[in-house]
Amino acid sequence: DTKYIAGQMMLVRSFVLGINIVAVEPTGNPLENIEQQLDFVALVPLQLENIINYSRERLDRTRCAIIGGAAVSNSLKEKIQNSKCNIFATYSMPETLSNIALQKLNGNDAQDYFEAFEKINLRLDNRGCLCINANYLGEEVVTNDLVELIDNKKFRWLGRIDNVINSGGIKIIPEKIETV
C-alpha cells in the first residue's frame, strides 16, 4: 500500500533495481493467484504464515522475501527453514524512511540477530533502547525498542519499553484496550 512508507519504498526499489512491480490488493495470501516467478516480495508475518500453509510452492519460486510490520515468531521461523526463497526480517520505522537492518531467517546462513546496513551506526541509550545514526538522517533516531547490542552494527530485538504491540504495522497500546 503506497499510503505507507513501506509501499513507497517498494516502488523505489523496483525503479532502482529495474524490476517489474506486480501489484495485488491487500490480502492474507498475496501469492495465492501469482503464477510467475518473483524476484522480490514484501510481506507481514501473517501473510508469510498463510503462504507457507496454502501456497508454499509459490514462495519457493520467489527469490527473496522481506518480512516486516511485526516480529516473526519462532514457530514461523521453523516452518521457513527449508524454503528455497531467501527470507529476511526487516527492522525499520517511518523515522528511518526504510529498513536499516536485516536478519536472515532461513538457510545455512540464518542469523539470530539483525545486522545494520553500511553507513548505519547503532548505540544504546540509558534505558537500553536502540539509537540509530545514519548519514541520510538529520539527527539520531531514538527508539523505544529494547535490544541486546552486540556491536555498533548488530543487535537482537527484545521488545518495547512502552509495551506497544506492533501488529502488521499498526501500533496497539494495551493500556488503551484495557479502558474499552
What do these predicted ranges mean?
Residues 1, 44, 93-96, 143, ...:
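Ser/Thr-glycine-rich phosphate-binding loops at phosphate-binding pockets of nucleotides
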